[in-house]
Amino acid sequence: MIMDNQKSTSKTTLLKLMLLRAWKERWTDCQWGINVKAVLTRGVSGDVYNLADCILQQAVVGSGANTLFLSYLKHSLCAHLISHAAVLKRISKYDHFEMHHCLIALLEFLESIIGGVTCRGKQEEGLLTKAMLSLVYWLMQIYEHAIETFSENRSLTTEQQEVVEKTANVLEKIVQSQFLLGVVFVGKFEDPELFGMLAKKCLEIENLTVKSGFVPPVVSQKNVTVNDYIRKVASIETETLEIKEFDGKGVEPITYCMQPLIAIDILFNPNCDTQMYVLEFLSIQALKGFPLSRLYCEIIRACLTCLNNVSGTSRESYICAFTFIKVPQIMRQIHLQTRVLTPNDFEDAKLDYSPDVVEAFELLLQDSAILDFMDAKCACNTVEYLLNEMLKHHLINEKYSKLIAAKRDGITSSLQKLDLNTNQHSIVKFVLRAEPPLVGILKTLSSDYNKVQEALLGMLCQVLSGNSFELILSVATVEGKLKTFVAGLIKCNENSKQVPGEMGKPAMTRAALFDVSFLMLVFIVQNYGSEGVLTDGTDSFFEKWVRECMVEKHKSKSPMNMVKLCDQNKVDELIVSLNSPDGLKATSLKWQEICANIPGLLYQVLLAWENETLSTGEIKKFLDSLKSRFCCFSICATSWLCAYMQIIRQDELLKPMNMIQQFVTNISSEEMMQQEYLKERLGLTVQIIRKMQIDFQRLPVASPKMRNQLQSQSLVSQAPLEEQFEEVWKGVLEKGWLPIEATLALENLLQSCGPFWLVDKLVQQIFHCKYIREMNKTMDIVFAIMHLDIERCTIALLSQLVPMMLLNKLQISEIVDPFSRVLAKLCVYCIVATMEAPAVPTKKRSRAAITAEGDELDTLCSTPKMRKIGSESCDSSSSDFMLEQVLAARDNPAPLKEPLQGCLQTLFRTFSQYIVSDELSPKIFFMFQLLSLLVEVGKDRIKPVLKLIPNGLIQNMMKINATDDMTVGFILRLYDLNTASGRQFAMSDLCLFRNIQMRKDSIKL
């Protein structure tokens, strides 16, 4: 039947008249649908004319609901004439809670439609969130009204009980629907005021329930009450929304990334601040989901493994100091920081110990194998030493210290107890003994120079005996006093410069102080890098010499520029003095002037030798005369010769190499007796020269023992690159952790070949694994190794390797699960680590990190023995490894910076290009796994990355990957719901996902 449309009557009025006629004539649902479509404009929703409002007004006019109108309402919903949002919003306005029959009818209607709630248009999406909040609030009001009635009458009528039961059923359906919970969660951000009222109403219901003695009815077989459902909705958080976990459930039993990470930090960033370690370890904890106790245990275990690997080497003292002095400081800092960040976890602030530390030692005791091995290796009870250091930092008290130590007593009864006065050889004991001397040296260095010259000389030279200097440096480094120590030595060296007219004992003492302080400073710079220990802007003699004349790795310096800086008149005078019988004793040049002009001297001597103006014997005598006066002269000469050897041909290397070798030959006993502490100074001189030889001479080191003794990172090797890597990786697989020598070799490969080559080789090792356990283990080790230069390696992985794998340019098999999942996890770990990497001066530098002077030099001569690699193996990023500022609060997401931001944008655009068909391929599933792991592992920290995802990527992926892996929790975690655009995109994706699910369910039916 078609109704006559009068121009003067609005369509809303027409709809109301139509409703009355439909009721009078008892239209069927089909008749109603036909006639109402004649009134509504094609393509226009009935919401525009308040159709849902009109129907519901007529449906609940009397004491009972009109089922005919409710059937019209349901038909209109099914025919998409009105939206679910409009219906829910209108129902939530009904406030006649005493009309039990109407309430029951409305609740039954809700129960029948709530499972199919969705959106069909953009306008509806914005309304549905508030409508769902209003509906939940309305249900809570009904329930509260029932409890109030019970409180007054001490009982409920049959109708009231049915209202409570129906309310519970609707709430149950809402809570059991992830889509509806997701809509409520979005509404929490869309209308915080209404959600606040909802949360407040929940508390009121809780209090009223307790006060009235009302027993909440059990809704399901799981003994869940209405109050439980209300509480779940009112306290909804991200964790409430389910997500498919690709990273596995629970915490992994064994972690393989901590030991390689600590090994890399110890070797290449020894002067790192405690807070930098704290941020790095907390980042690993968040990625792995460790509790603090597990984190502490893993740190200690990793350090003990590293210490075992370096026994008997020059690095042993530093790693020992790091383990027993630095680690307690790090744990103390983590303890304090976590108390600030998570105060609820530390309710009892009066504890004189950390329960996490106690639990960490309990976990450590379970790994008795490494403890037994280290006790025997270090000739001490390592647990007892660690406990004593923890006591100093108030991380554990006497009671628990004794309890934990007692558990090891039975095993270590044959070992000597901790006693610093015993003569038993123990590196741990020696390291701890080095703390008091360090304090004394720093105090003396800060005293009046004129009053402590002899005492200072004796103290410094005594330190040079044995390995005391390395012990002192190790302790100074881990305690953060290395810069203070260096500043004191520079001050001493500056004060010890030659004073005209000074004679006798004072002059000899001053000369020895100048020499020994210079040697010690060179040794420190050689091992710790000039950036980490020297201060910018200062102009002392030593710092000027380091900047202009000292050869350093990754800092090319032109030897000819050094020659140009020399004063030719002083060079000539120096030559005359060395040719005289008295040698340098008769020269008027000051010590510091000789050091500065040695490059010019050696250049002329080399030219004379090559032109056969001087014989080999004369050269030897010449060099012996130079080195006999001061040891620092040998260092200055060797430094220039090493720089000079970088620019000459292979057939010209022999003469400068022989000159360097002459500086390490023994001197006569008579000369040894003429100068104070010459033996100690010569010992340090030989160490410095040997390291320069290994680092800068263009010949491979044949003796592994020599490379093990010296901290060499020589790029020179006779073996092909592939063989070097395979040999290193074979050792890693055999041990299950990263040996120190392997770490150095991998750093060499990174510097030689660039990050792409190394990352490619590392990722290939994951694909060689047969079992998931092996894949995860290898992935952990690969992730840690990439911290050699985490930014550049991450960029190489994301911008080069992953796109090439997707395009199959590497001619490898298809990226399929579980390989794709492990690769995606590696990508996510690297993204988070790069974002959160602290900004510190570091020795992990790229070959591009050289001065302009070096750039000019490289145009003349390439770095010796550098392999020529194809363009595909070169790194696209040549920038220095510069990290961003350290964040004060971990809960604030680290901002994305270039080049990571641009790299991720390009990667996501690449993903969009692949999603062009409706076919689910392994490549598309890898993209989904990557995004899922981003939100699963990265959580709130990854928000800046998620903002880069192109619009439409998720919806296109949902249309293809409409599997159980796609969840509401995943979708909502992708967006920042604090922003209007984030909520809009989230609701759009949610509704599309809902409609896809409903279509699948209808097909199954």
From Swiss-Prot:
GO terms for cellular component: mediator complex. It is found in: Nucleus. Pfam families: Med24_N. Component of the Mediator complex, a coactivator involved in the regulated transcription of nearly all RNA polymerase II-dependent genes. Mediator functions as a bridge to convey information from gene-specific regulatory proteins to the basal RNA polymerase II transcription machinery. Mediator is recruited to promoters by direct interactions with regulatory proteins and serves as a scaffold for the assembly of a functional preinitiation complex with RNA polymerase II and the general transcription factors. Keywords: Activator, Nucleus, Repeat, Transcription, Transcription regulation. Component of the Mediator complex. This is Mediator of RNA polymerase II transcription subunit 24. Signal peptide: none annotated. Its main location: nucleus. GO terms for biological process: positive regulation of transcription initiation by RNA polymerase II. It comes from Aedes aegypti. The gene is MED24. Belongs to the Mediator complex subunit 24 family. The keyword Transcription regulation applies.
